[in-house]
């Protein structure tokens, strides 16, 4: 087995999710505490947004359905969102805004506190406190 040496000094990774209904997904992420940072429209139609929460960004793009309507999105992928904020308060705000949590806030085996939730298109998210050093 060979060991590779890190040569890329990346400063961030920004996922862009292709969603079924961009406005519905915006509402979902706003319930988690994200804010719209940029919007892209064409002819009055919302094509996508860049959301921001703290130092992180997530892009949302409206599916144009050119690849068909029967394809599954979000399969085999989970977004982990780490925060220094109180997980129980974030979960309570999300629930008050109408989100249904998949897993309620709980202590994890690696020492953080987390909850799970699914975005309307099917993308899975875990919102967690940062792992202890």
Q: Where are these predicted regions, by residue range?
A:
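C-terminal catalytic core of tyrosine-transesterase DNA break-rejoin enzymes
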Residues: 121
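Short acidic-aromatic low-complexity motifs
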Residues: 19-23
């Amino acid at each position: 087995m060979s060991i590779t040496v890190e040569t890329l000094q990346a400063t961030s990774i920004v996922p862009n999710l292709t969603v079924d209904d961009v406005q519905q997904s915006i509402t979902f992420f706003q319930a988690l505490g994200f804010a719209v940072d940029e919007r892209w429209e064409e002819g009055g139609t919302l094509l996508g947004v860049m959301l921001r929460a703290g130092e992180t960004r997530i892009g949302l793009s409206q599916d144009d359905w050119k690849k068909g309507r029967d394809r599954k999105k979000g399969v085999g992928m989970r977004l982990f969102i780490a925060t220094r904020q109180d997980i129980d308060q974030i979960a309570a705000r999300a629930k008050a805004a109408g989100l249904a949590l998949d897993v309620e806030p709980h202590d994890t085996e690696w020492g953080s506190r987390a909850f799970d939730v699914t975005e309307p298109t099917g993308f899975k998210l875990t919102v967690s406190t940062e792992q202890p050093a």
